[in-house]
């Protein structure tokens, strides 16, 4: 699975702040289908570090409750691509963002045999943004996605979107 479309000229400092996971999609149904599925994570905040890395604060359902997690995504030579060692994934790719309203990103595991890909549409405010969702769906067209979830504003406000 190769994600080719990444954001050109990403300014990582501008993605700082609060975000909400409005929609998610994955290459394999089992990555997202259950509340506690491996890549069913809910982004809360992105914090660029002075070194150009990215701290991702998120929530994930574990052992019957909503747990807080922090992932450090290390910068690479490509501004929109980061290395991670978490959630069984090894890369975070920023596909597109306007910094003010939406951000589209994917998490990828390029290692055989369990190649996987999960992408999310993040929004700044807990509202449904149809324009952002359209961009998300357009970006997904080129990718082998088999499950897609979207959340309503009430879910966006809740812990782990419950």
Swiss-Prot record:
Compartments where located: Secreted
Primary subcellular site in the record, as a coarse category: secreted
Post-translational modification: Alternate disulfide bonds occur in equal amounts.
Domain of life, source organism: Eukaryota
Disulfide bonds: 66-160, 106-119, 106-121
One CC-aspect GO term: extracellular region
Keywords for this protein: Disulfide bond, Milk protein, Retinol-binding, Secreted, Transport
GO molecular function: retinol binding
Family as reported in the entry's similarity comment: Belongs to the calycin superfamily. Lipocalin family.
The protein's role, per its UniProt record: Lactoglobulin is the primary component of whey, it binds retinol and is probably involved in the transport of that molecule.
Subunit structure: Under physiological conditions beta-lactoglobulin exists as an equilibrium mixture of monomeric and dimeric forms.
Protein name, as recorded: Beta-lactoglobulin
Protein's organism: Ovis aries musimon (Mouflon)
Gene name tied to this protein: LGB
């Amino acid at each position: 699975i190769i994600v080719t479309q990444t954001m050109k000229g990403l300014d990582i400092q501008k993605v700082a702040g609060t975000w909400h996971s409005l929609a998610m999609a994955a290459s394999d149904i089992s990555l997202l289908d259950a509340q506690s599925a491996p890549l069913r994570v809910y982004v809360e905040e992105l914090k660029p570090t002075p070194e150009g890395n990215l701290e991702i604060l998120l929530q994930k359902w574990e052992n019957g409750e909503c747990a807080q997690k922090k992932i450090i995504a290390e910068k690479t030579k490509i501004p929109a691509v980061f290395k991670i060692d978490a959630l069984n994934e090894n890369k975070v790719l920023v596909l597109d963002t306007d910094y003010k309203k939406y951000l589209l990103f994917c998490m990828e595991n390029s290692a055989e045999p369990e190649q996987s890909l999960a992408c999310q549409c993040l929004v700044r405010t807990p509202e449904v943004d149809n324009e952002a969702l359209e961009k998300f769906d357009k970006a997904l067209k080129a990718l082998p996605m088999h499950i897609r979830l979207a959340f309503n504003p009430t879910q966006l406000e809740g812990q782990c979107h419950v």
